[in-house]
Regions:
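N-terminal cap/lid segment of alpha/beta-hydrolase-fold proteins
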Residues: 31-73
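Short, surface-exposed "cap/lid" segments of acyl-processing enzymes
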Residues: 70-105
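Conserved catalytic-core motifs of eukaryotic protein kinase domains, centered on the activation segment
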Residues: 90-92, 124-128
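Second-shell loop/turn segments in exported
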Residues: 102-103, 126-133
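Alpha/beta-hydrolase active-site loop
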Residues: 130-150
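Conserved alpha/beta-hydrolase
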Residues: 101-123
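Primarily recognizes the serine-hydrolase "nucleophile elbow" in alpha/beta-hydrolase
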Residues: 145-188
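Central antiparallel beta-sheet cores of small beta-barrel/beta-sandwich binding domains
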Residues: 1-23, 27, 37, 44
Length: 188
């Protein structure tokens, strides 16, 4: 919460969250964001817009596949899972696109990635506002299955940020012996 007063055209006060409190001064102005990290084409890898279906929840997920040059079934592939709150495939915040930056780095270093819009956000369908972590885990499992069945990757892992890390560990702990069930590795 913020409590304060207007003084000399500024808002001056305290911002409090839980046990933390800090002084805060807000002034009007124009902020120009600099995002020099955002990858720009041409890329030394291939990108492909894809859609895949979570049939159990009747959700279509839309994403971007980044395929390194010379990829094949032994190329490592990573499903990228965003943190809490509905987000696009790039996990964009204030014009910064951390998942696009990470996917670019990985593709340049021989690792394929699949990042997708959360259900109910961007180009993905479904009800994201009422979705649970378990719902997002089923979406991520569908993404892993897409990489294994459709793209034929054999070494598929999960990279999860924030709530995405919880999803990654849920998938890793799933004891389903099916061929397409568990990630081969987790980055959290």
């Amino acid at each position: 919460t913020f409590t304060g007063r207007k003084q000399d055209g500024k808002l001056i006060g305290k911002c409090t969250q839980g046990a933390m409190s800090t002084d805060l001064e807000l002034s009007p102005g124009i902020v120009k964001l600099k995002r020099p990290q955002t990858p720009k084409p041409p890329y030394p890898y291939t990108t492909k817009e894809v859609r895949f279906n979570n049939l159990s929840d009747d959700v279509t997920l839309a994403g971007t596949l980044a395929l390194p040059e010379g990829f094949n079934e032994t190329t490592p592939a990573i499903v990228m899972i965003t943190g809490s709150g509905l987000q696009n495939r790039d996990e964009e915040i204030y014009g910064h696109k951390p998942f696009a930056v990470i996917a670019d780095y990985l593709a340049r270093n021989g690792i394929a990635t699949l990042r997708y819009d959360d259900r109910g956000y961007g180009e993905s369908t479904g009800d994201g506002k009422n979705a649970t972590t378990e719902d997002f885990a089923r979406d991520a499992k569908t993404a892993m299955e897409y990489l294994r069945k459709e793209m034929k990757f054999k070494n598929v892992g999960i990279l999860g940020h924030s709530e995405g890390a919880a999803v990654a560990f849920m998938l890793g702990a799933d004891n389903n012996p099916g061929l397409f069930s568990n990630p081969n590795f987790i980055i959290a």
